[in-house]
Every structure is written in structure tokens, then in C-alpha cells.
């Protein structure tokens, strides 16, 4: 089971993003493949917030376009939502302490805790996730790590 980070979603939906083609191809492949693909609500909210922001993109998506993208992902048979469970708070506290995480990196710790709690591998291009001990993560846009 994989858990998808927002950076891959943003790259896949913005043609001017440097990693657009690779991200789009990867996302289409995993959503049509046999593996379980999971999203966290915070990732989907971040996609809505960032993808529609004209301060971030010269040509942001409309809210309707961003909502349609999310709906299309969730409609795939392999897709679903991972939510924090009963162990989330304890896992998050440990990650925040051990990874010396604060500020902007706190949401990374939340996503890492969700992945750890459910045994998911996090797919991201963000190397900051290497700070979280025990987290299985990969950058699917590179051949080998």
C-alpha cells in the first residue's frame, strides 16, 4: 500500500512543473495498477489549497478543476483514504520529538504518522521525510535511490 504526498499530485496536474510528465505518468500507472493507493485528507486539502492559488501558479486550476481531479483519483478502484487512527497521537509525538520537527515540517510529521500507523510506503519527492525513523518512503520519479 502506498500513501501519496501532495508534491506528486501538484506536479502531475501543472503542465509547467518540471516533473510534470513523470509525475502524471506515475500517478496514472499506480491508480490503474493492482496496488492499493491511499490519500490522506490533509494531502487532498493541500492540493486544493495550492493548486488553485494564483500566488503559486501562473495558471492555477479552478476550484472545479481541482475538485474534479480529486474526485477522479478517489473514483479509481485502487484508491482510498487513510485516516489517523488510535495510535496517531503517540506516533506523531514520537516523530516530532525524534525528528526535531516544528513549524512547516509538522504536516510532514502528520503524514508520516499516518503512513507508519497503516504500514504504508510514502511516495514523495520531499527528502525531508528521511528525518522520520522507521518511515518507508520513496521518490517514484527517480530510477533508483
Residue ranges and their predicted role:
Residues 1, 112-145:
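Acidic, PIN/NYN-like endoribonuclease modules and their adjacent C-terminal/linker elements
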Residues 1-3, 7-39, 54-68, 144-145:
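Short, well-structured N-terminal submotif of metal-dependent ribonuclease cores
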Residues 5, 108, 126:
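Acidic active-site catalytic centers that drive phospho-/nucleotidyl reactions
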Residues 33-34, 76-77, 118, 132:
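Structured helix-beta-strand junction loops
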Residues 38-41, 124:
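Short beta-strand segments at enzyme active-site cores
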Residues 60, 78-123:
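Active-site neighborhoods of divalent-metal-dependent phosphate/nucleic-acid chemistry enzymes
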Residues 73:
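Ligand-binding beta-strand-loop-alpha-helix segment within the catalytic cores
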Amino acid at each position: 500500500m502506498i500513501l501519496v504526498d501532495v508534491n506528486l499530485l501538484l506536479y502531475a496536474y501543472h503542465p509547467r512543473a518540471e516533473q510534470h510528465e513523470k509525475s502524471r505518468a506515475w500517478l496514472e500507472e499506480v491508480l490503474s495498477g493492482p496496488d492499493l493507493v491511499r490519500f490522506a485528507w490533509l494531502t487532498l486539502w493541500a492540493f486544493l489549497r495550492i493548486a488553485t492559488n494564483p500566488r503559486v501558479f501562473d495558471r492555477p486550476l479552478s476550484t472545479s478543476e481541482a475538485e474534479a481531479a480529486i474526485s477522479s483519483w478517489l473514483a479509481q478502484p485502487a484508491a482510498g483514504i487513510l485516516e489517523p487512527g488510535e495510535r496517531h497521537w503517540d506516533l506523531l509525538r514520537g516523530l516530532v520529538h525524534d525528528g526535531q520537527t516544528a513549524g512547516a515540517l509538522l504536516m510532514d510529521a502528520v503524514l508520516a504518522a499516518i503512513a507508519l500507523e497503516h504500514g504504508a510506503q510514502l511516495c514523495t519527492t520531499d527528502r525531508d521525510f528521511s528525518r522520520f525513523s522507521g518511515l518507508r518512503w520513496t521518490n517514484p520519479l527517480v530510477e533508483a535511490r
